[in-house]
Design a protein with these regions (language model features):
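Acidic helix N-cap motif at the loop->helix transition within catalytic regions
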Residues: 53, 77-86
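Short, acidic, metal-binding catalytic loop of nucleotide-sugar glycosyltransferases
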Residues: 57-66
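Short beta-strand/loop segment that forms part of the nucleotide-sugar
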Residues: 66-75, 93-95
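Short aromatic/hydrophobic "clamp" motif used to bind/position activated sugar donors
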Residues: 117
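Conserved donor NDP-sugar-binding/catalytic core segment of glycosyltransferases
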Residues: 127-161
Length: 223
């Protein structure tokens, strides 16, 4: 996957993976009809280039639900972030300093009123309808505390965004062999490779922070 510091985008596609809910089943969003629900997308920007523009533009077709986009501006190029936000109807928050990723995301979510919240890196490019597929997966899996999409690298390969909780042996094997033998069995197990890794919905131990969807009720319980 492209990291947040690189300008080449990662694609968010429509094949969700989920992490078990550790705070109890959350059903507030499920009381509304799907087309009545709303979603807030939060992203943290630090002197972004064209990546933020692509991110915001792609969100226009990612969901048919009511969408609110909030950008936490942690950098110094405030005019660039503000201009991009104005072009795409987003809101910018920040105090002019670098709050850090977590604090920036929390600030952007501070007044959350929507039914769902997404925290995503600004170098993602959303495929049409992909956010709705992700939310639909959340509705179909009410015990999931957090969901993430299938992430594609710029070359179309799958980034292992849903991973297992490694044992000591598997973790050590992945750490030692991962770079010199990428397809080793320890890394494959850690990356939860195998059937279903590139499609459908599956349960994983943890999800990449590049793109996370949570029911608003689950987010509030974490505060």
């Amino acid at each position: 996957m492209t990291s947040v510091a690189k300008p080449t985008p990662t694609s968010a596609s429509a094949a969700p993976v989920s992490a078990p809910d550790q705070v109890g089943e959350c059903s507030e969003a499920r009381a509304l009809a799907p087309d009545e629900q709303s979603v807030r997308v939060v992203t943290v920007a630090f002197n972004p280039g064209e990546e933020l523009e692509r991110f915001l533009a792609s969100l226009a077709t990612a969901t048919a639900r009511r969408l609110v986009v909030v950008i936490a501006d942690n950098g110094t190029e405030h005019d660039v972030v503000t201009a991009a936000a104005q072009r795409h109807g987003a809101r910018v928050v920040g105090d002019g300093t670098n709050l850090g990723y977590g604090a920036g995301a929390n600030l952007a979510a501070a007044d959350l009123e929507e039914d769902w919240i997404v925290v995503a890196n600004p170098d993602l490019v959303w495929r049409p309808g992909s956010l709705d597929v992700l939310i639909d997966a959340g509705l179909a899996n009410p015990a999931a505390g957090c969901l993430g999409p299938l992430l594609l690298n710029p070359d179309g390969t799958v980034y292992p965004s849903g991973r297992a909780l490694p044992s000591l042996v598997k973790g050590a094997g992945h750490a030692v062999l991962g770079r010199i033998w990428p397809d080793n069995p320890f890394s494959a197990a850690y990356h939860t490779a195998g059937p279903g890794a590139s499609g459908g919905t599956r349960t994983v131990g943890w999800l990449s922070g590049a793109c996370l969807l949570l029911p608003a009720a689950a987010w509030r319980r974490l505060e």
